[in-house]
């Protein structure tokens, strides 16, 4: 028997960045919110303290903060002529679970999209002609930079972002990113300290005519009271950042930045260890009536609600839509349908820089967002004429993850084990930095998400099936951006050797094994045309007007940036329209 | 090179004075003999000797300890006995198919059963790895790393090698609370100061940070971590002559 609970105003699936932001904003607007989260309750104060949290085996290798593939995974193949098999072990990406979601173990690299990124199709078509987009499902987002700016700015104030503005109200500022869209206000906090390799990268990039700046960081640099009145403290550069929770209250996360200021709100209720199985629909299929979930005792419960918010992370939002029959599934044969369409990822490459003994990188001193970056080869910040690709990526010397089990840089041609390997690890550990090329990812018709015909999860539901390989466009992009990174690396002082790795190298297929990024995007994209988007420009489903969708599943194609800044800008934009329009008069906010 | 294997064994023994007076062949038989008396949690003595031999090819002794000297076999034993070895974090529902390398782990084995069955099949019939001379042990590991020339039934060779090599590195470099990285051997080697981490004043300085390592369970004033992994075990796996 399914137990039915009293109706609530809003039910929110997932207690990560987007779910808790939705709860806070809607609770303040007088809506009774029930947040349903499948993982455990936890808190920075009680769960993430050093030194116990500084356990690389437990958190970075065994991944105790992340999803457990036994209860949640997907199946994967490179192309639709293969048989998808389950991702049996975590690898390429590490979705979160529990209070705060992946937001507790993110790096905190906090970006904004470029104005041109948000109108990618029309921008490229105008500048280069339509042909440059042949074969690509590249689309406009349907929402502009100017519309998102106040919300991007607000999220900077939730996180206490540290950085140097490059464009303040249209005025170019020294030391910042000159390519960024105009900011209405400066960063709330000054940039992080630059380690010696970052200083060298900055000097060389400058000499080569590029525009280096310190990466925008949600590893806070000063004591800071955020927009909700929560208190953050300065980062200690402890080096146990991404994959770990921060016990210093220094990494902006959804628990200390939002949960703490909404937890006692009369309109807020949180149900932990509860797995939402599906969204239920009304008889006519036009609206959702609530969600069915398994409570902490494993009993099936129906929570009716006037409004449903999907905040379960990009991949699992799409999964919930598919198992609930929300929207129309994408069919790669006909190109029709939208749910699962335009799945994209992040295209990563890197140059490794091996210094002589004069340069001490001390890689264990680091922070998730400690980086010196150039944006000269991102988006359309450079001329794409005759390059054969669209998009780009930022190039950044990052000092983020120099922990002893995972970080063993060795110069090219070193054997991969044995005496020479051991010697090389010893000699290079303290004298190396990685320069990352963090590249965009276009959408193409053959990359998509649907349901697996064979494999089922612990709840008897079909696994989400991912079909993905790096499109030719992105292989060319990645090779190009990597060649620029390599040039910088070779021009740096005190460099003995340079190595390179390119995940999207010609002839190599995308693999779910090595970690790349937890930046899965698309599958339920935003737009103004219901035949190519799942939600309208307000994040509202075209087919079910009381379902609102949050997260990187909204991205029509992936940016050359990390997703959380952009997706939180979208979240606050959607919440703004819910609070100030939809909830007073529930209806489709755009005509289909 | 008639003397090669003996020389290799002597090199393998490193600083141990006994090596000079004991014939190489006898040494080989006794190599890792101490492992026999260990109260293993998962491994048996012959599996432990196989893993010690292989681990010491992957991370041999030089100015710094070999893998087995740093407690890597203890570490692996405890890991295989624990949740990771027993398949926590692995989705093991069928049907099973070989898949492509890009699809990752596709065997029905848990890490513990993968390694148990893998070793059993590798050691079936021929000379045991522990009894080979250093040169042949290296050659064996080289072949295993490339997956060349082995048929291990339902144990995928590449997966087996990758799993053991990952465990060896984890055992050499993880916090000593898990039984490896004994006396901070791995951390001393690379200059990693450990879990107690506060670097605000140093991060922008181009200078070494000469702090002795401190693990999660560091015992103040000793240069060691408390042996929280298995208090009963006094000795780690060590090559003996
Ligand atoms: C190691 C790592 C580093 C990262 N670094 C960066 C970075 O530097 N910069 C950046 O921009 N981004 C980064 N990210 C990505 C960032 O964490 C995500 O973009 C962000 O957390 C997304 O927020 P979300 O609310 O959409 O989803 P999540 O934070 O994933 O939250 C979703 C929540 O929903 C819950 N849930 C899912 N399904 C169900 C269900 N059926 N029932 C109930 N609950 C459910 C999950 O348990 C989870 O808690 C990183 C991610 C990882 C893993
Ligand atoms: S590096 Fe800074 S922000 Fe990251 S976990 Fe350590 S103290 Fe927190």
Regions found by a protein language model. Name each.
Chain B
Residues 1-17:
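N-terminal secretory signal peptides and thylakoid transit peptides that target proteins
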Residues 3-7, 44-51:
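Onset of an N-terminal alpha helix
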Residues 26-28:
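Boundary at the C-terminal end of the N-terminal hydrophobic targeting segment
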Residues 31-45:
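Short N-terminal segments immediately surrounding and downstream of signal-peptide cleavage
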Residues 35-36, 48-53, 64, 68-241:
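Mature-region segments of soluble proteins
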Residues 57:
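Substrate-recognition/specificity elements adjacent to catalytic centers across diverse enzyme folds
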């Amino acid at each position: 028997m399914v137990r039915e609970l009293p109706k609530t105003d809003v039910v929110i699936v997932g207690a990560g960045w987007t779910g808790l932001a939705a709860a806070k904003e809607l609770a303040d607007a007088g809506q009774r919110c029930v947040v349903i989260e499948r993982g455990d309750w936890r808190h920075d104060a009680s769960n993430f303290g050093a030194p116990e949290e500084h356990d690389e085996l437990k958190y970075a290798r065994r991944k105790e903060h992340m999803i457990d593939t036994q209860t949640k995974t997907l199946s994967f193949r490179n192309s639709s002529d293969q048989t998808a098999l389950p991702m049996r072990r975590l690898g390429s990406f590490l979705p979160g679970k529990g209070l705060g979601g992946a937001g507790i173990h993110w790096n905190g690299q906090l970006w904004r999209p470029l104005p041109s990124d948000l109108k990618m199709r029309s921008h490229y078509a105008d500048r280069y002609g339509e042909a440059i987009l042949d074969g690509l499902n590249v689309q406009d987002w349907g929402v502009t930079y100017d519309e998102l700016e106040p919300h991007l700015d607000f999220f900077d104030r939730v996180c206490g972002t540290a950085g140097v503005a490059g464009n303040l109200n249209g005025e170019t500022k020294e030391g910042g990113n000159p390519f960024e869209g105009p900011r209405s206000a400066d960063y709330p906090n000054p940039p992080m300290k630059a380690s010696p390799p970052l200083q060298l990268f900055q000097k060389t990039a400058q000499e080569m005519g590029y525009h280096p700046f310190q990466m925008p960081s949600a590893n806070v640099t000063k004591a800071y009271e955020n927009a909700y009145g929560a208190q953050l403290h300065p980062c200690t550069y402890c080096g146990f950042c991404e994959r770990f929770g921060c016990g210093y209250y220094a990494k902006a996360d959804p628990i200390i930045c939002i949960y703490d200021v909404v937890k006692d709100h009369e309109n807020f209720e949180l149900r932990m260890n509860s797995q939402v199985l599906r969204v239920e629909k009304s008889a006519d299929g036009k609206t959702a009536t609530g969600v069915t979930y398994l409570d902490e005792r494993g009993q099936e419960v129906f929570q009716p609600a006037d409004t449903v918010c999907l905040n379960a992370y990009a991949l699992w939002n799409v999964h919930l839509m598919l198992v609930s029959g929300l929207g129309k599934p994408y069919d790669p044969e006909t190109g029709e349908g939208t749910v699962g369409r335009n799945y994209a990822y992040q295209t990563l490459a890197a140059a490794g820089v091996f210094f002589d003994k004069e340069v001490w990188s001390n890689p264990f001193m680091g922070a998730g967002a400690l980086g010196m970056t150039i944006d000269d080869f991102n988006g359309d910040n450079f001329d794409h004429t005759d390059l054969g690709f669209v998009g780009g990526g930022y190039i950044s010397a990052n000092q983020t993850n120099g922990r002893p089990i995972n970080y063993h840089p060795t110069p090219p041609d070193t054997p991969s084990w044995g005496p020479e390997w051991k010697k090389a690890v010893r000699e290079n550990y303290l004298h190396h930095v990685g320069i990352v090329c963090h590249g965009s990812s276009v959408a193409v018709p053959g990359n998509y998400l649907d349901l697996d015909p064979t494999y089922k999860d612990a709840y008897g539901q079909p696994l989400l099936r991912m079909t993905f390989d790096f499109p030719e466009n992105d292989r060319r992009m990645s090779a190009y951006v990597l060649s620029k990174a390599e040039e910088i690396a070779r021009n740096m002082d005190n460099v003995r050797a340079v190595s390179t790795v390119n995940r999207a190298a010609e002839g190599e297929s995308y693999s779910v094994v090595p970690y790349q990024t937890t930046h899965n995007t698309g599958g339920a994209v935003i737009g103004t045309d219901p035949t190519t988007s799942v939600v309208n420009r307000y994040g509202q489903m075209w087919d079910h007007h009381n379902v609102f969708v949050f997260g990187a599943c909204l991205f029509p194609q992936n940016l050359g940036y990390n997703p959380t800044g952009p997706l939180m800008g979208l979240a606050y934009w959607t919440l703004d329209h819910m609070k100030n329009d939809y909830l007073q008069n529930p209806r489709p906010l755009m005509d289909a | 090179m008639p003397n090669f294997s003996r020389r290799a064994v002597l090199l393998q023994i490193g600083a141990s004075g006994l090596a000079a007076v004991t014939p190489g062949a006898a040494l080989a038989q006794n190599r890792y003999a101490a492992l026999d008396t260990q109260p293993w949690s998962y491994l048996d003595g012959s599996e432990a000797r196989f893993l010690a031999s292989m681990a010491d090819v992957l991370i041999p002794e030089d100015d710094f300890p070999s893998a087995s000297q740093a407690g890597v076999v203890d570490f692996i034993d405890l890991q295989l006995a624990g949740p990771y070895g027993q398949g926590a974090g692995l989705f093991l529902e069928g049907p099973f198919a070989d898949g492509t390398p890009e699809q990752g782990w596709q065997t029905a084995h848990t890490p513990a059963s993968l390694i148990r069955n893998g070793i059993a099949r590798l050691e079936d019939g021929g000379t045991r790895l522990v009894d080979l001379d250093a040169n042949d042990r290296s050659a064996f590991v080289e072949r295993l790393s490339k997956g060349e020339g082995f048929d291990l039934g339902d144990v995928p060779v590449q997966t087996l090698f990758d799993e053991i090599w990952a465990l060896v590195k984890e055992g050499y470099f993880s916090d000593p609370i898990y039984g490896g990285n004994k006396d901070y051997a791995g951390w001393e080697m690379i200059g990693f100061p450990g879990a107690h981490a506060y670097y605000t004043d140093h991060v922008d300085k181009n200078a070494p940070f000469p702090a002795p390592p401190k693990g999660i369970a560091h015992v103040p004033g000793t240069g060691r971590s408390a042996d929280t992994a298995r208090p009963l075990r006094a000795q780690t796996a060590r090559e003996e002559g």
